[in-house]
Amino acid sequence: MRTLWIMAVLLVGVEGSLVQFETLIMKIAGRSGVWYYGSYGCYCGSGGQGRPQDASDRCCFVHDCCYGKVTDCDPKADVYTYSEENGVVVCGGDDPCKKQICECDRVAATCFRDNKDTYDNKYWFFPAKNCQEESEPC
């Protein structure tokens, strides 16, 4: 029951690009981003500090860094366009900022797919107190 409540809290207020990010993770990695990465390691979910715990957590670290480089639009809210060509997601549209958000999400979803074998349940709901080391630069 606690897990269902946490999942509901994670979904409250989610709009725009975050919904699209979830869709891309499902499409590319074949699993739910909210479920598997909504609260994982030191970087997956809200916030982020310390050292990434494994390759899956590093995907989130790189995604956070990518979002940090986006200017002139809101990576968590703005809606972008993409298409699928021969099974490959291609970011599109005329707005370079929104295209950059899409690329951040596409790269992260691909990273999750490529690192499924490193996913370790011990990092699910990982305590923030274990993420106190100095963060590495992006």
From Swiss-Prot:
Active site: H63, D105
InterPro entries for the chain: PLipase_A2, PLipase_A2_Asp_AS, PLipase_A2_dom, PLipase_A2_dom_sf, PLipase_A2_His_AS
UniProt catalytic activity: a 1,2-diacyl-sn-glycero-3-phosphocholine + H2O = a 1-acyl-sn-glycero-3-phosphocholine + a fatty acid + H(+)
Location in or out of the cell: Secreted
Molecular function (Gene Ontology), one example: toxin activity
Cofactor: how bound: Binds 1 Ca(2+) ion.
The entry's keywords: Calcium, Disulfide bond, Hemostasis impairing toxin, Hydrolase, Lipid degradation, Lipid metabolism, Metal-binding, Platelet aggregation inhibiting toxin, Secreted, Signal, Toxin
GO cellular component terms given for this protein: extracellular region
Binding, Ca(2+): Y43, G45, G47, D64
Enzyme class, first EC level, given as a word: hydrolase
Gene3D superfamilies associated with the record: Phospholipase A2 domain
Gene Ontology biological process terms, A to Z: arachidonate secretion; lipid catabolic process; negative regulation of T cell proliferation; phospholipid metabolic process
Cofactor(s) the protein needs: Ca(2+)
Location, primary (coarse class): secreted
Tissues with expression: Expressed by the venom gland.
SUPFAM superfamilies given in the database record: Phospholipase A2, PLA2
Cysteine disulfide links: C42-C131, C44-C60, C59-C111, C65-C138, C66-C104, C73-C97, C91-C102
Main function: Snake venom phospholipase A2 that shows a potent inhibition of human platelet aggregation. This inhibition is concentration-dependent when aggregation is induced by collagen, and concentration-independent when aggregation is induced by arachidonic acid. In human umbilical-cord vein endothelial cells, this toxin stimulates endothelial cells to release prostaglandin I(2), suggesting an increase of its potential anti-platelet activity in vivo. PLA2 catalyzes the calcium-dependent hydrolysis of the 2-acyl groups in 3-sn-phosphoglycerides.
Further remark: Negative results: does not inhibit platelet aggregation when aggregation is induced by ADP, and does not induce aggregation of washed platelets. Does not induce changes on the principal platelet receptors (ITGA2, ITGA2B, GPIBA, SELP). In human umbilical-cord vein endothelial cells, does not induce detachment, does not interfere on nitric oxide release, and is neither apoptotic nor proliferative.
Family: Belongs to the phospholipase A2 family. Group II subfamily. D49 sub-subfamily.
Database matches in PANTHER family: PHOSPHOLIPASE A2 FAMILY MEMBER, PHOSPHOLIPASE A2, MEMBRANE ASSOCIATED
Annotated protein name in UniProt: Acidic phospholipase A2 BE-I-PLA2
